[in-house]
Amino acid sequence: MENTQVLLNIVWTMVGAFLVYFMQAGFAMVETGFTRAKNSGNILMKNMMDFVLGSLFFFIIGFALMFGGSNAFIGTSGFFNPKALADADGMFNGLPIGVFMIFQTVFCATSATIVSGAMAERTKFISYLIYSAAISIFIYPITGHWIWGGGWLSQIGFHDFAGSTAVHMVGGLCALAGAKMVGPRIGKYTKEGNPVAIPGHNLPLGALGVFILWFCWFGFNCGSTTAATYNLGDIAMTTNLAAAAATLVTLIVTWVRYGKPDISMTMNGALAGLVAITASCDVVNDYEAIFIGAVAGVVVVFAVEFFDKVVKIDDPVGAISVHGVCGALGTLFTGIFGEGCNFITQLIGFVAVAAYTLVLAFILFFILKKTIGLRVTEKEEVDGLDMHEHGCSAYANFHFHNDK
């Protein structure tokens, strides 16, 4: 019976890992659909390279920093050979170490790819690649160690079941730093500083991406049990209810606020609910999940407006609001509604992770800006990154209207 349970755990964790991997396709579709056609190929390349670089650098360095030893702040063993961390039977945290490693790898790549959309349409490809490697080496693994690797936050009882904090808030705050440092797209703001809408070129692609992400989120949250347990259905229910509540509330808020139900904002509402419930999906009941999702559905609308109109940070896909703000919201709500969780502990974790992430991300992007540069030239941005960065177009033989 014990061997059967281990095999079931292995199969379930691998299924979860495969679903989380496919979230890369969801992010690629959302980001491509919400931006202009002339930059589609560049966005697809960035999403692919997030997974490629995340896989390699997390294997070589990141996994050791995250899970190598019981130091409260940083892992200290397993560099370049993470499988050396396994016990004599090749097991790690109750699973064969290869199974555990691939599951953690896809989570790392998910955090990295959140930044792509926020910096879309004006960022140098080489600079983005360096960022993508860096987050997989020393940003995500360090805070991940604090939360999931036996570090100081886990020791004081901080709860982040599937990554509202460790994955989404970290990625969202890196997106905030990156979007601020690279600056807004040409034509995003008038001379008076008023924001100008720059519509995405393909809402059907964006919708497909949202559906893919919603589907894969069941692997993200339910798979985080890393075991075939009886509470999988409960986790799936809280995940789905939060997303549904957030979507409906965002639709209503935009309908009232703008006079019509906004399509792209409503899609982001679904993602906001999923992000917000990810920390607490295992420790809240169904109605608490609905409430968390509903609040996220309101917050995401006003967060997008705040960054767009008040602080004037250009985020083409709303990644900062969806992942950064709603990740923080989910972190704190876990302390209010989560069974056995403590608000002060969650607040401490939020502040610590936010401070570390923002400081490191701003330093990284500042260095890139002052050395090789973060931004493409004005001509490259106006013409489109596909042709200038990659020498081809995602839509061959189509004519684009290139405006500023």
What are these regions (language model features)?
Residues 1-404:
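Hydrophobic alpha-helical transmembrane bundles of multi-pass membrane proteins
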